[in-house]
């Protein structure tokens, strides 16, 4: 009986620690998203002050990797392997391995190229007017802050850095500061879930 009670206490403690870690992860993700949005807004203001266009690329989005295999969609989900957020803010594209190029889904300016313990290596590209794309869990980044990238230009290489259950690309789109489901635009995909 004593070992069962101790086991229950240990189990509850682990569950509490896991819940606290997930809450920290979600708070960190929200803070990073807010920082990306702030930088995007700052870039738009600078471009407007310099007389540059702040319009988004009207050409639409392209697939950021060659794979079309979706392993997790945006929104509520069971966290794979018990890691990561259950309120998924993007779309995970799998079957990419560790060496696939990641392409800018739209032309724009790199506002973040960094490493974070949750997102791993990641890149955020501003397309103007509060529109951004985010590429996470990269094994390496090919661009730096301030770089203008053309649509289809390589911004990094796929990987599994940060909180990740295996090699994939976590891809996010924001429009006018609101998170948008990437599958609204990237419609020719294979369901992997």
Model-found features: residue ranges?
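Alpha-helical oligomerization segments with coiled-coil/rod-like character
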Residues: 1-58
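Catalytic cores of peptidoglycan-degrading enzymes
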Residues: 57-193
């Amino acid at each position: 009986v004593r070992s069962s009670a101790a086991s229950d206490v240990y189990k509850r403690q682990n569950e509490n620690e896991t819940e606290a870690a997930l809450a920290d992860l979600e708070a960190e993700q929200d803070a990073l998203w807010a920082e990306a949005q702030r930088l995007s807004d700052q870039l738009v203001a600078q471009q407007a002050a310099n007389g540059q266009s702040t319009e988004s690329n009207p050409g639409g989005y392209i697939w950021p990797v060659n794979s079309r295999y979706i392993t997790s969609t945006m929104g509520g989900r069971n966290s794979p392997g018990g890691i990561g957020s259950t309120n998924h803010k993007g779309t995970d594209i799998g079957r990419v391995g560790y060496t696939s190029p990641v392409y800018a889904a739209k032309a724009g300016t790199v506002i973040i190229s960094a490493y974070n313990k949750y997102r791993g290596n990641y890149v955020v590209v501003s397309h103007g007017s509060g529109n951004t794309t985010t590429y996470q869990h990269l094994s390496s980044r090919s661009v730096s802050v301030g770089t203008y990238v053309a649509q289809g230009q390589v911004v990094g290489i796929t990987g599994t850095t940060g909180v990740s259950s295996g090699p994939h690309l976590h891809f996010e789109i924001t429009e006018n500061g609101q998170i948008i489901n990437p599958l609204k635009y990237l419609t020719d995909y294979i369901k992997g879930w």
